[in-house]
């Protein structure tokens, strides 16, 4: 389903990704482990086109992309098949949990608001936050904020979800 070959990325003289290869089959759960600063986040960001790789190739669902030469249109199209749960969650501080989940569906995917709300509520229920849909991020614990970010990701029904530091704030009961 997803294959990355020879991916390279440098920041100035610092080579962070040195011809990394990775293959992930449908249904696989893959963890990338390493010390701080070893390129884990950079790899995920390059695979989701949030960072431009210096080289390499990405194959996804039978499509081949030369990293470093992917058009904005192709990157956006591919991103619609994926979701990214950021280390700092990237929630909108002025929006409720439900609004954080539905915003991308309504604005990005042009989904009718009523349908987005229904999907958003289902996603919040899956992560155990249906009773917190009207809470703002400042009213939620770190683990609850991360679960809102996870709900936002699963609401889009992606083929792949990238998690950056997925266990950093999760509550033990999830």
Q: Language-model segments: which ranges?
A:
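ABC family nucleotide-binding domain
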Residues: 1-174
């Amino acid at each position: 389903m997803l294959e990355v070959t020879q991916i390279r990325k440098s920041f100035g003289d610092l080579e962070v990704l040195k011809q990394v290869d990775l293959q992930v089959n449908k249904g696989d759960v893959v963890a990338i482990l390493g010390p701080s600063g070893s390129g884990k986040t950079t790899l995920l960001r390059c695979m989701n086109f949030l960072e431009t790789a210096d080289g390499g190739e990405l194959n996804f669902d039978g499509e081949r992309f030369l990293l470093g030469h992917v058009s904005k249109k192709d990157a956006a199209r591919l991103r619609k098949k994926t979701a990214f749960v950021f280390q700092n969650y990237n929630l909108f501080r002025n929006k409720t949990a439900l609004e954080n989940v539905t915003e991308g569906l309504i604005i990005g995917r042009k989904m009718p608001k009523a349908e987005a709300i229904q999907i958003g509520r289902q996603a919040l229920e899956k992560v155990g936050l249906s009773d917190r849909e009207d809470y703002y991020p400042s009213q939620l614990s770190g683990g609850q904020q991360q679960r809102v970010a996870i709900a936002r990701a699963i609401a889009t029904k992606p083929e792949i979800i990238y998690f950056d530091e997925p266990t950093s704030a999760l509550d033990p009961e999830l």
